[in-house]
Structure formats: structure tokens, C-alpha cells
Amino acid sequence: MSLDGSQASDFTLDSTAGEEVTLSETLDDGPTVVLVNRGHWCSFCAEQLQTFSEVAYDLWFHDNVDILPVVTDPVGKLTEMRDRYDLDIQLLADPDGSVADQYSGTEQTSHGLTGIAATYVIDTDGTVRYEQVADHPADRTQGNFVRYFIRNDFANPFGDG
């Protein structure tokens, strides 16, 4: 089921910054990017998060965009991941997968319950303006694409097709 064009589900999760983060509160300032990631062990997740870490300050400073990576792991594992990959963004803990379920869904893997990798760009009114759910764990939207998408009034650089 696609969420593109629909209202995003609100959520509040604990972050690696030691605070709770609520989606609706970030939307008060500007668009928000929600990334659903599989776990601290996922190299594809780390690669994607690094691309968003590289553009996060630029998006926040120039466009008031927040990046919210939701990962189906406890905060302790996410803190290790953040430090290991030198990420400049906070990670949000969704250990029971309840938020991932509202977005891209979850699946049982050899690592336990994991979120299905996905990227969402949510406008200030809560509307999902972009959705990409991975067909394969390596299938990811990168930070530069999202920056282009937001700065060009949510226009897909590859056209509508």
C-alpha cells in the first residue's frame, strides 16, 4: 500500500541524542525526511545514512528540513552505529517495529524483526510527497536526490514516469 499523497502517521521515539522526537513537532519547522532502516548491522543502511549525514546540516540550515532515521533497534545499538559510522544525525529507536509497521512494514529476518527499508519526504502539512520502499535491501534513495527533490518544489528529477 503506497503512502504517497496520504497523511503520514505521527510518532514519538527515543533518539541517540537522549531525547524524544515527535514527527509532528519537526513538521512545525519545515519538511521532514523519514528513513526506515533495518538495523545497526545493515551495511546498506549505514551507507544511506552516511549520504544523509553529509547533507543534513545543509538541508536544515537552508530548507528547515529534519532527517529522522527510524531503525528497528534499541538506542544502545544505535548509539554504537552512530559512533562507528561517524554520523552527524540522530537515530530514532523503534525496537518493536511499531513505527516501521505504519510506514513500510516489518519482516522477520535472521537478525529478528527488521523494518523494510524506505524513504519518505513529508511536507509541513503532513502529506507524504515522496515514497520509496526498497524492493531489495540495497535499493536506497540517497541524500543528494532528496535535497534536489525538496529544493525543486518536490519535482522528481527523472520525471513522472
Indicate where each model-derived feature is located.
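Chalcogenol-based redox active-site neighborhoods
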Residues: 1-161
